[in-house]
């Protein structure tokens, strides 16, 4: 996969995006991630990329010209590598909310471009370049850089061969539609807090059933809105019924 980033602050990506999983993906050839400063494409002699909005108002808007030209250049570079133009993602608080399903969708692409804004916003004509407008949530950041890093990390870890254990990503919270079940490592007894017996029983069938039940329990407790009953198997529905009874009994004791 190739991920292009258009940003006024490319140095922000030099650390986080070259460490851990994303860094290993680059090192192992699963990912290339050029970061382009679109100020370099400004035709203004002062290198300006923003201006006041027509009609007045607070703040400055990013001008279309530097971004149009920077995107054209990166798309030509991608084409030289045999890659399609790909999807152009505008980081915008008014966009659709990013989640695991969006990350999975992005992970199927060969080429993505993240457009990181700054200042008050964008000239509306920039949106003609865009295929997706995406937000991290109902809050405003100074720029799109931090949001794009989160989305890139969530996407890259889903690429085939990136994670050391191929089963890691499907087991993550939200990948199955449920939160992840509790996990434990050694020692089995730490300051009186013990690992559930089933996990050290060696009975893989019972372990899997326990994990399904505890994933349902955690989701029921913390994010019941995620539970789609139509998507649950008959076994999961039985386990969820047990969880509800147990949680009601626990609540009545408190």
UniProtKB/Swiss-Prot annotation:
Keyword Methyltransferase tagged: yes
Coiled coil stretches, renumbered: none
Organism the protein comes from: Levilactobacillus brevis (strain ATCC 367 / BCRC 12310 / CIP 105137 / JCM 1170 / LMG 11437 / NCIMB 947 / NCTC 947) (Lactobacillus brevis)
Stated role: Specifically methylates guanosine-37 in various tRNAs.
Enzyme Commission designation: 2.1.1.228
Designated gene of the protein: trmD
SUPFAM superfamilies linked to this entry: alpha/beta knot
Single Gene Ontology BP annotation: tRNA N1-guanine methylation
GO MF, one example: tRNA (guanine(37)-N1)-methyltransferase activity
Pfam families: tRNA_m1G_MT
Subunit field text: Homodimer.
Family stated for the protein in its record: Belongs to the RNA methyltransferase TrmD family.
Keyword Methyltransferase set for record: yes
Subcellular location: Cytoplasm
Record field: catalytic activity: guanosine(37) in tRNA + S-adenosyl-L-methionine = N(1)-methylguanosine(37) in tRNA + S-adenosyl-L-homocysteine + H(+)
GO CC terms in record: cytosol
Keywords noted in UniProt: Cytoplasm, Methyltransferase, S-adenosyl-L-methionine, Transferase, tRNA processing
Protein name: tRNA (guanine-N(1)-)-methyltransferase
Main location: cytoplasm
Binding of S-adenosyl-L-methionine, residues: 117, 136-141
